[in-house]
Amino acid sequence: SAITVEKIDTTLVGSIGYVFRYYDGAERALNGTGQSWKDVTEGVLHAGQGYIFQASMEVYLTVRGDMDSGMQMLTPASKEIPVSENISNYASNQGWNLIGNPYPCYYNMNGIDFKSPITVWNKDSWTYDAYSILDADEYVFAPMEAFFVQVPQGTETIHFMPEQRLAKAALVDGKWTTRSMRSVSGCRSLI
């Protein structure tokens, strides 16, 4: 399902500028980092694809969905997200994809059928953090949270198993995870 950008409300104070961008892994594979973020020009955000939201000041997004969007959490089907290898002459630039949590709910990373590390934006430190299922790391994606993957050659899709959907933030080692409680707010967020 998709959300049109025009239907996303922002609580604005004064006049601010904002933009939604997608990540172009093919551009990175060809030319390295620096020009990989592209403006969303079609006015539609697609479930499963990651985006960055940037604003000239802190704003709060309200995304309204229809009943079909709400039923996505209840469907027994897994979600299959296509990814691109993006072959490059440099291994560090190859295979990068920005994936969005395809469910409108919290999601435990252990439900992803993908064994390479995932990289998430840490809005508190303005850095990226890496997590690995193989290293028994724990991470819970918030609704509308995006993350980077560097896909190995031969990988065409990433599967999200429905059993790891969560109605609220999860307990990890007996504590509420702060990342899963994060709001989609601020000047820069991956969604």
What are these regions (language model features)?
Residues 1-165:
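N-terminal exported-region signature
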Residues 163-173:
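Short amphipathic alpha-helical linker/capping segments at the junctions of internal repeats
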Residues 172, 177-191:
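Cationic, amphipathic, low-complexity alpha-helical segments enriched
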